[in-house]
Amino acid sequence: MSTPSAPHGDLTDMKAILAKVAAGNALNEAEASLAFDIIMSGNATPSQMGGFLMALRVRGETVDEITGAARVMRAKAIPVEAPDGTIDTCGTGGDGSGTYNISTAAAVVIAACGVPVAKHGNRAMSSKSGAADVLGALGVNLDCDLGLVRKALWDARIGFLMAPRHHLAMRNVGPTRVGTRTIFNLLGPLSNPASAKRQLLGVYAKQWVEPLAHVLKRLGSEAAWIVHGSDGLDEITTTGPTTVAQLKDGEVTVFEIEPEQAGIFRARPELLKGGDAHVNAEAIRALFDGAQGAYRDIVLLNAAAALHVAGKAGDLKEGDERARHAIDSGAARAVLQHLVSITNSSITNEPVAAP
């Protein structure tokens, strides 16, 4: 796909852009779009790319810069058509927590409540099991035709969008390693190929909660919660309070929530620790078969928040009740089985059912 057609800033090449950021100056959105277009088109040298990313990192990326970069990521992505009302539950990763797969399990529960979920993700960054790892262990075919991803999204109400398959331009970035987090750690959750207009987005550091809400506002999101747990999780945590930046009706507000608001007891952090993909897959199967405990509680809390963002629950308590019913009725287990079945099927010319 072509990149955004909006006019760029005054800078016209990577050398000029690099000089500006190296001097400690911020780029405007158009200049940032130009820079990332150059990088993702393979027209920046490794040294230019590394220097640019580190200069942004040292100074601190701005809302303009993140927005401009995300526009390029979105424009270059291979898209997937999604139903109206689709939500994404995604995190930046990198929180180093090693928990069970929380947002992935919550995504299945949300879909079982009737809300389409375009789950955008990748393999593990900070744990032994990322979204792709655990879904693969559950039997989802991660290499299925993209037509089947679309079919799953419409028919099972959940599709897994494997980031490297949709963001081919990232191949031009992959060889560059600067040994620390960069803006690209933030861009994945902002670049859903299904153009989901509603997001529950977890971040690895509290400093990004409010800025990313403003980025999503600029990118046209209708509603979003950007969250960071007080224990460091890029999820809504059950061990204590969670900082939330809410995008609603074009306004961004920041507040804290507590698990008790959903009727959920606080948990000890060690009860959320997971294992490798197979251990975490078994935990998800047990959860959908009715297992109780801290893992169920944190999945319920995150699903409840997503249902609220999706406009399907007035508050966390109502969202929690809907999520509980989705698990206890067997609907979540059925959705997972449907997802596995579709991704392991053959492409047909049958029309995709509307939700």
Swiss-Prot record:
Textual note on the cofactor: Binds 2 magnesium ions per monomer.
Residues noted as binding Mg(2+) 2 in the record, renumbered to the chain: 234-235
Enzyme kind, highest EC tier: transferase
Complex formation: Homodimer.
Alphabetic keyword roster: Amino-acid biosynthesis, Aromatic amino acid biosynthesis, Glycosyltransferase, Magnesium, Metal-binding, Transferase, Tryptophan biosynthesis
Function: Participates in the tryptophan-dependent indole-3-acetic acid production, which is a phytohormone released by A.brasilense.
Annotated residues for binding of anthranilate 1: 91, 122
Pathway: Amino-acid biosynthesis; L-tryptophan biosynthesis; L-tryptophan from chorismate: step 2/5
GO process terms (BP): L-tryptophan biosynthetic process
SUPFAM superfamilies (UniProt xref): Nucleoside phosphorylase/phosphoribosyltransferase catalytic domain, Nucleoside phosphorylase/phosphoribosyltransferase N-terminal domain
InterPro entries: Anthranilate_Pribosyl_Tfrase, Glycosyl_Trfase_fam3, Glycosyl_Trfase_fam3_N_dom, Glycosyl_Trfase_fam3_N_dom_sf, Nuc_phospho_transferase
Gene: trpD
Binding-site residues, anthranilate 2: 177
GO molecular function annotations of the record: anthranilate phosphoribosyltransferase activity; magnesium ion binding
Protein name as it appears in the record: Anthranilate phosphoribosyltransferase
Residue runs in coiled coils: none
Higher taxonomy: Bacteria, Pseudomonadati, Pseudomonadota, Alphaproteobacteria, Rhodospirillales
Co-factor requirement: Mg(2+)
A single cellular component GO annotation: cytosol
UniProt-annotated binding residues for Mg(2+) 1: 103, 235
Known catalytic reactions: N-(5-phospho-beta-D-ribosyl)anthranilate + diphosphate = 5-phospho-alpha-D-ribose 1-diphosphate + anthranilate
Residues holding 5-phospho-alpha-D-ribose 1-diphosphate: 91, 94-95, 99, 101-104, 119-127, 131
EC numbers for this chain: 2.4.2.18
Family: Belongs to the anthranilate phosphoribosyltransferase family.
Native organism: Azospirillum brasilense
